[in-house]
């Protein structure tokens, strides 16, 4: 089980609801992933009136916990306003907070992120901040009152996997009581497994599943990878070595093998 802001969930795979070929494929992929938390963009929900109502109905049919996000926001004021609108629309105080600082890399504006997180926490929100892997930023978010921190593995949609393993490991070591979720940059099930092997509590995916040739099958693959990664972490992974270490015992080795 994994705890998000006082609520227990069995799935460690959070999934996004954008970019799918069709609404039906989105539903089937979310089910195949076994996801219990689904991120939803306020802009997607409110765009198009009736179309937004249909989309929201499809999400409700899944019986999942909705995590609204502030995707596309580039200023503190825009993000805070979007979060408040999302709370009213979706009836939840949970918000995945994004404040984008660069259009090319979609890197978070970490200064604005901390400012927005502080304001939203003070306004009663449970903030899930999307950030870089920088420890000092994560610690400021925790100091602001965030119970969850969501560092990227790599830029959004890049599918590069974990590019700074040491930094992510440091986050886990220094923030043992904080729920940590790798968010963005994962492109393959093996990337998700690697994040869980580092001790991260969960991963959040969208593009890697939505843009797969078979989104439903890929969702199932990620589900298995996340489960395998967590089991591996809990089982205790052996330490990496610089040199070989024989796994075959020398006791009982024929005597002529010892003759030089």
Swiss-Prot record:
Pathway(s): Cofactor biosynthesis; thiamine diphosphate biosynthesis
UniProt KW Transport keyword: no
Gene Ontology CC annotations of this record: cytoplasm
Known catalytic reactions: [ThiS sulfur-carrier protein]-C-terminal-Gly-aminoethanethioate + 2-iminoacetate + 1-deoxy-D-xylulose 5-phosphate = [ThiS sulfur-carrier protein]-C-terminal Gly-Gly + 2-[(2R,5Z)-2-carboxy-4-methylthiazol-5(2H)-ylidene]ethyl phosphate + 2 H2O + H(+)
Database matches in Pfam families: ThiG
Source domain of life: Bacteria
Binding site for 1-deoxy-D-xylulose 5-phosphate: 157, 184-185, 206-207
Ranges in a coiled coil: none
Active site: 96 (schiff-base intermediate with dxp)
Record has Secreted as a keyword: no
Molecular functions per Gene Ontology: thiazole synthase activity
InterPro entries: Aldolase_TIM, Thiazole_synthase_ThiG, ThiG
EC number: 2.8.1.10
Record field: transmembrane: none
Keywords of this entry: Cytoplasm, Schiff base, Thiamine biosynthesis, Transferase
Subcellular localization(s) per the UniProt record: Cytoplasm
Entry's family note: Belongs to the ThiG family.
Annotated PANTHER family: THIAZOLE SYNTHASE
Function: Catalyzes the rearrangement of 1-deoxy-D-xylulose 5-phosphate (DXP) to produce the thiazole phosphate moiety of thiamine. Sulfur is provided by the thiocarboxylate moiety of the carrier protein ThiS. In vitro, sulfur can be provided by H(2)S.
Subunit structure: Homotetramer. Forms heterodimers with either ThiH or ThiS.
Protein name from the UniProt record: Thiazole synthase
Natural source organism: Rhodopseudomonas palustris (strain BisB18)
Gene responsible for this protein: thiG
């Amino acid at each position: 089980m994994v705890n998000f802001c006082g609520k227990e969930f069995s799935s460690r795979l959070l999934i996004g609801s954008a970019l799918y070929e069709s609404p039906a494929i989105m539903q089937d992929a979310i089910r195949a992933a076994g996801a219990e938390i689904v991120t939803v963009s306020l802009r997607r929900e409110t765009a198009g009136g009736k179309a937004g109502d249909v989309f929201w109905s499809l999400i409700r049919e899944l019986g999942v916990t909705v995590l609204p996000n502030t995707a596309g926001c580039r200023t503190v004021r825009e993000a805070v306003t979007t979060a408040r609108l999302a709370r009213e629309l979706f009836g939840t105080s949970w918000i995945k907070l994004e404040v984008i600082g660069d259009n090319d890399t979609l890197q978070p504006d970490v200064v604005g992120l901390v400012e927005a997180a502080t304001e939203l926490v003070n306004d009663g929100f449970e903030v899930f901040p999307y950030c870089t892997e920088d420890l000092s930023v994560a610690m400021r978010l925790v100091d602001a009152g965030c119970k969850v921190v969501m560092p990227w593995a790599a830029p959004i949609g890049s599918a590069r996997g974990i590019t700074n393993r040491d930094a992510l490991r440091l986050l886990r070591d220094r923030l043992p009581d904080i729920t940590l979720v790798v968010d963005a940059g994962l492109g393959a099930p093996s990337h998700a497994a690697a994040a869980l092997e580092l001790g991260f509590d969960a991963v959040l995916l969208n593009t890697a599943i939505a843009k797969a040739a078979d989104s439903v099958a890929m969702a199932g693959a990620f589900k298995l990878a996340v489960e395998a990664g967590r089991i591996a972490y809990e089982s205790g992974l052996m330490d990496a070595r610089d040199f070989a270490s024989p796994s075959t015992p020398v006791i009982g080795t024929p005597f002529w093998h010892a003759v030089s």
